[in-house]
Amino acid sequence: MEIIKGSTSTLYGGGAIAGLINLISKTPEEKRDLGLHLNGTSGKGLDVSAFYGQRFKKVGTTIFASYNRNWAYDPSNTGFTAIPQFDRYVFNPKLFLYFSENTQMSVGLNAMFEDRLGGDIEYIKGNGNDTHSYFEKNKTQRHSTQLTFEHKFGEKDRIDFKNSVTYFNRNIGVPTYTFEAVSYTHLTLPTN
């Protein structure tokens, strides 16, 4: 992780007033990297994640999986959620191919599924009626692919190719309105 404090972002410049955090992806090494993270919160939350990474000569892999859960949370006893009830699943496998010292490629997939339900606590508990009828439902799916190819011709000359295809689907519902959107995006960056 790289933390840049203040408005010195290369990409956003002075627009990044509070700074910027860059998450740098892990790449597999010969020594196995295995981790498990468990976290519970005072806001009725639970986080479980696992990571595995290892390189075997010409092939390597990283696999990240997580589950996040929050039960409906109303700390002020207003009868409405401050934090909605949700379940989120994330899966991110990635394959690395090392053709030679100068040529490598990686292929990855990101998949995320999330169901959220916020609003009236009684409705969320299954006790909805004319008085307890407000809710906000949000169902989201996001899937994306990652492809990178790099070839070095020398110390200063190289070519990089990066590609990503993303599918995003969201359904949002409140008692009198439903919204549904599907988005497909594609990005290709050849650089040298």
Where are the language model's segments positioned?
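N-terminal periplasmic accessory domains that precede
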Residues: 3, 11, 15-37, 50
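Transmembrane beta-barrel domains of outer membrane proteins
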Residues: 4, 24, 49-55, 64, ...
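Short coil turns and loop connectors of transmembrane beta-barrels in diderm outer membranes
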Residues: 30, 57-58, 101, 155
